[in-house]
From Swiss-Prot:
Iron-sulfur as UniProt keyword: no
Keyword set, alphabetical order: Calcium, Metal-binding
UniProt name for this protein: EF-hand calcium-binding domain-containing protein 5
Biased composition (Basic and acidic residues): 465-477, 578-598, 638-655
Keyword Metal-binding: yes
Location of region: Disordered: 255-655
Annotated ranges, domain EF-hand: 773-808
Ranges of biased composition (kind: Polar residues): 258-294, 322-334, 342-354, 362-373, 382-393, 402-414, 422-434, 442-464
Gene: Efcab5
GO molecular function: calcium ion binding
Start-end of Acidic residues biased regions: 564-577
S-S bonds: none
PROSITE patterns named among the record's database cross-references: EF_HAND_1, EF_HAND_2
Coiled coil: none
Amino acid sequence: MLMQVEKKKLLSQADIPTKFDPINYLGEYLMRHNTHYIKDPGVSGYQRVMKEITEELKTHVPDTINNRISKMKEKVKEKREQREYISTVKVKVAGMRKQALEEQFNEWVLNPKGMIPIVVYISSYITDLKSEVFEEFLKHLCHSAEEFREIILTDMRRQMFAELFLQCDSGKVMALDRQRTLALLEAFYDQCSSTTRSLLRNPRQWPFVEFEEIELIEFWGDMDIKKHIYEDFDALLLKMNMLVAEKLAGKLAENKDLPQQQRDQELSSDSTTEPETATQLTSQQRSRRVSLTGQGQGKGPRKTSASKQGASRGSVAEQGSRRSSGVNQTQQRGSVAEQGSRRSSAVEQTQQRGSVAEQGSRRSSTVEQTRQRGSVAEQGSRRSSTVEQTQRRGSVAEQGSRRSSGVNQTQQRGSVAEQGSRRSSAVEQTQQRGSVAEQGSRRSSAMEQEPQTAQDPNSDSLPEQESHRGSITEGSHRGSISEPGQRRASVTGQRRKSSVDDSGSAGSRRGSGTDQGQHRGSVGQRKGSGERKMSASEYGPHQESITEEPLTASEPGPQIDTIQELDEDSTPQLEDDSALKESKTSELTKIETQEEKPLLLINEEQVPRDSKQPEVPTSSKKERPSGSPKKGRLSGTSKRDSQKDKACEPKPQHVEGKKWSGEFLICDWKIKHVKSEEEEQAKLICDDTRFTDLHATIRNFQTYKGIKGRSAFNGVSLDLLQFVQLLETFVGEDTSFSLSKDLASFFQKNYSETKQEKIKALEQARQNSSRIRRRILLQAIFEKWDNDGSGFLDLNEVDDLLYTYKEGMERESMKKAKLHINFPEPSPGHEVKLSSKQFQRYIELVVSELRGNEDEVLESVVEFLMGSLERSHVEGLRNCARRKWLHQIQYAAETSGVSLEPVYTETFRVLTQDAEAHGNKKISAHISLLEENVFLPERGHVLLRNVACTLDDAPFVLNKVLYRDMKGISFTVVDEGKPIHVPQVQHHGNIFFWNSFRSKNEYNGSFLALPLQDAYMRIFGVLAVDTLRDPHEINIFLPHEIKFYQGVANAFSTAYHHVHSREHVLHSVMTGIRWLFSVTSGITTITTCFIEPSSEQEDYVLRNMMVTDCLGLAEIHTDPPTITRNACIFRDFLFKCTDTSEVILASSGGETHIAIPLRQRTKEAMGILDVNIGRSRMLLYQEYKDLQKMVKMIQNVSYEILGEFSGEIEKTMVIEMESAGEVKRAGILFFRTMLQELQECLCLLDSMDFVSLLLYEHKYHVDSILQDITLQEVEANVALVHDVLKGVILFSQREKDSLSDLEEWEKWKFHINKYLVEEICVLDPTASNVEVNVELVTSYIQAHSRTEVWNFRNIVIELLYHWINICLTLIELNMRQDVSIIPPLPKKSATSIYAISSERSIREKL
């Protein structure tokens, strides 16, 4: 220690701090030189190794800590490696999917920049998709690309027609003559060839011709099928069906003498020979699958062995690119080969344990058994081979390279033998289930089979599809069917090479067993490189897949069994592959027994067409493969798929030889070409300095304008939208773009107007602009005058101000205007109130009596009134706010989805907002509606029910009833029709307080009751407002508040009737649709939508109110979903219909739609009927005419309902049943309107039309000879005539006593005369004095169908048949006490801040 101190010179540096600690140093020295420490001499290497081995062996001792820790480490390591592997596979799959998307999007038409950023966007959503779903998604994108191309082509066509319109509009009035346009379309239609005419739409028929332009006799009695919108559509369809029926009947006759098993095979194989592109048939034929009908001689127990049944199971032969494997499959223990990650295959099993041979590599063919020992190929007339198998169960043989091995199995379940390399061996397996044998490298195995049936001498030899072939096996009593060439479905299996594991296994497993019966059994799958690589969607150069094609369904048999499984053992193999293998689900249908086999359905497109007959499409052009995308085949699956699914074929970037500009005309052509005349005139007035005080008012009500962007149909002229749509409807979707060019060229050459016509058109345009300008000015001056928003002006006040015009010089002239106008009846105070429309009419009459140009005089009068009405800035702001609030009530009604709840809510919100903002009050309010007093008539004929109120008053007011014998002033308001204001309710003795818990000291406030009036000034309810909850001592309503509350009552009345008018229209639509479905069968669904204004940038939206299916079951949405224009680019035909107010025929998603507008009285569309007719190109002519009848009746009913609610027409009661109530009347208006039209049409008939029916039975022999009608048909026609006439006679009320004993037809004939016709033309079947034997009439009519009546082709029978059915329907409805169809009820929302009654008012108004 001292030596260290001296060495470090620590003694000389005593004053310097140091880190040297002598104690620590001394201790360390002593520890290092401890004499008692003995150093370990060490161990040998042998001892060290043995010790390590011992420690390692301890980990294998069960139930020890080391053992458990070792197992945990192994599992952790295994899971970590698995996660790393899965992550690597996901990266590979994501890369390949991205590449597939990039290749797929080359199908889309690119914009000028040549980029589609959506590829990157979609890539983030497909990461977790299964392989099958991803391929279906790719196919969906293919069809979307095809539809997108069609949209571009349609946009190009519409742009060409728009340019044509501008060229033909030489006067620049933005209108073309409609009749001249239709005449040119007829001329172009007539000069076209028959082939072209079959693709065009007939311009002489509806929808080109309106119902008002068709005579009644022609509308109801024209049954000439040649006048269909598609020329000879019915005849062509009937001819095709007859040819198919004859072909099928001949085939059945040929097979009658064949054995049952062979006959079934022939039928089933024949059904697969037809093209799989049929798109127009019944719902059973919409999927591209066909049921095979190979059947045995009987049904045996499912679990009996092959030896007991004397038959073996069938097999599914699945062939790879360079090898093929035979698969034996049973009904209960069959197996299915499933390949790769996320691949699945479905195998159909018959009730006789039959089998289906399927083969791949872009073709379908029968798999010929390999040239090995003991195999016999048996071929049928359809070149199908059947090979008999020994009594073994479920064995699978796999083929190597030019060697074969047999696998013998005992009666176990689903075992599979695994083979070695380059040698043939037989392995017997027992007591094993679900094992999978796979072979390493290029070897093929063939199952040895003992021939049990001789080869058919008439069978043809099967050509070899590849160098190696699979086999088809079947038992002696169980048949299998396979179709050659393109007439057979196949299962294509392709495998890739895989490395052999070091442990000696045959290779990592790529396939998984999929159980069909007892979920036991398997199919061995082998891997190997193929001669041709195929995939449902090709990702890269090394990509392969299993492709299994479904068959076309020819019978509705059992449902398809599809099983999809994911093989967990396939994940290690993916690491060795450079590309992902995809597989397509094989869809096979079950085989039915002979007893249950239905007749094959007729497919239109299976008929061989005549060489002279043009190929007329009978289905939608834009049709996808039938069924959902899941049922369709993927692009690239096979050669036949690519031929059928043209949407998945490569497409050029040019459309009709032109590169797309990247812009759509339909998106902005309204801005460029379509201008609102009202907006233009409003802009001109706002630029005029003479009307400065009206500018703010005009801007306000232009902002609050309702629905914009619709063209009204006027029947005289066509604007740009209507012209383009008319031409687009004419050319249809099946014509070429060149035909549209020819049509445009034809129009440009032949459309011309004379000088007088141009001058007349310009004059009409000027008058229209002047009329709109006058209306805007008068509406603005009315709103400025009505500063408090009451909705009315006092006539005396208006006269007093008008008479001062020009210092009274025009006083006498103005008084003359009162002689030409009918003012409303004066109120009890002798005041005449003018509404906005009445005020405008009155001023126009006053101006017409003054000297000078009417437009200049009117502007002078408006300028005078504007200067005479002085309003302060505060009054102007208050007027602006109140106008906005009143508009919100109407807006709530228009966007309510036919519900009153939003109207009630918005009404109370407006009342409370105005009371707080302009009166500094807290109010309570409730709405009472008049109802008929049914239960207590002694307390008054009517009662007032509180249907809505503010939330605080709900426990005391809501749903309470006020009778006439109770205290209150509400019935006084109802009787007098004017508001009543009680300033202090505590001093009034006739006020009824709903809250009985309130003390009399709290009865401090004002009460105001206002009448609710309809368009005819009839009272239907009361709006009550009070200030009992206001804390202020003085809370009296001021005059401007009372006037505004009158405006609120008026706005609520308008909104209330708006909702109920739409509700009644919806009620009538439902009735009409149900009638249509009762007489037609070709319509799938009918969707009813109403137009509503939009709060967004769009002009309007559609609300899906109701969907009715073919059974007449209607789904009514209480909260209807909204359809926006931007969200339905592939279904834009709905908005085309509402934009133009014209009928649209379009295709969407492979289905044909007929979009029919529901027009309001201004001829603008207020709704739409979307008629879906499925995959048919068009309805039959009879159904098409019945659709027209339904549409015409609904439109007439809508005009009547809307006119009654708006006050434009008076309500008329035609039949007695209409007085039963508003709701019930709305439900029968459709039948009443049809009854009226039928009676009017019967009156137009000549007497000889009825006489010819009486003589029909005497000339039936002549008809049978001249018209080539069989005797049975003539007798059926005679029975039809007799029964219809008997049914009509039974409605006669003049001689009903003499009709009871009639038995022979000779006695019935005496009652058919002109008096009977006159009687049925005015008969009211619902009258109380009309007595009809309904059961007897029904017995005569119900035996005859609608089709039978139509085929008779007689207008009298047609009219009488409909007349009888309508009368019976009205009688049935009249006998019911309740309403058979209830319109949608107002929804009740829990989030509403106002209370609304859940019970519906009957609304029986006085």
